[in-house]
Structures are given as C-alpha cells and as structure tokens.
Amino acid sequence: MSAAAQQPNAKAGSPNDFLKGVIGKNVNVRLNSGIDYRGVLSCLDGYMNIALEQTVEYVDGIKKNSYGDAFIRGNNVMYITALEK
C-alpha cells in the first residue's frame, strides 16, 4: 500500500469542525430507531442533544409529520449528515 493511501484525507476535518460548519444549515438526523428528521440545525450541545427548526419526520423514507421545532436527545442519534439546499 502506498504512503498516500495510508494518509487520511487532508480535507477531512474533525467531527467537531463538521458540526460547527452545519449549524444553520439543512441536515438529516438518523435515530437509532431508523427514523430520519430533516431540518435546519439550530444548535447542539456536548451531549449531542439537537434542536432542529422546520423539521420533517421520515419513517422508511416516507414523510410522516412536520414540526416547527424539534428537540432530539443525543443518545438517540446514530448520525448527522449535511443536506444539499
């Protein structure tokens, strides 16, 4: 394996950098249960508790509910991804 292949991507930042960069942007939050919440990331804390605005709930890819604001407890979060919008 070449030395370049062993090096991490130089453009990859830390998870903390990613989270700071997506505040105020559209994100998808996947819960351990498989439910997705998509909305604007308002804030989060050190426990990964999340506040979303303009939130839409998806179950198995199907829109189920819309919420103005949603608060998600951090221990339920599997991952957060940035959305294109």
From Swiss-Prot:
The keyword RNA-binding applies. Keywords: Cytoplasm, mRNA processing, mRNA splicing, Nucleus, Ribonucleoprotein, RNA-binding, rRNA processing, Spliceosome, tRNA processing. It is found in: Cytoplasm; Nucleus. GO terms for biological process: maturation of SSU-rRNA; mRNA splicing, via spliceosome; tRNA processing. GO terms for cellular component: nucleolus; P-body; sno(s)RNA-containing ribonucleoprotein complex; spliceosomal complex; U4/U6 x U5 tri-snRNP complex; U6 snRNP. Disulfide bonds: none annotated. SUPFAM superfamilies: Sm-like ribonucleoproteins. It comes from the Eukaryota. SMART domains: Sm (SM00651). Component of LSm protein complexes, which are involved in RNA processing and may function in a chaperone-like manner, facilitating the efficient association of RNA processing factors with their substrates. Component of the cytoplasmic LSM1-LSM7 complex, which is thought to be involved in mRNA degradation by activating the decapping step in the 5'-to-3' mRNA decay pathway. Component of the nuclear LSM2-LSM8 complex, which is involved in splicing of nuclear mRNAs. PANTHER family: SMALL NUCLEAR RIBONUCLEOPROTEIN F SNRNP-F, U6 SNRNA-ASSOCIATED SM-LIKE PROTEIN LSM6. Component of the heptameric LSM1-LSM7 complex, which consists of LSM1, LSM2, LSM3, LSM4, LSM5, LSM6 and LSM7. Component of the heptameric LSM2-LSM8 complex, which consists of LSM2, LSM3, LSM4, LSM5, LSM6, LSM7 and LSM8. The LSm subunits form a seven-membered ring structure with a doughnut shape. This is U6 snRNA-associated Sm-like protein LSm6. It comes from Mycosarcoma maydis (Corn smut fungus).
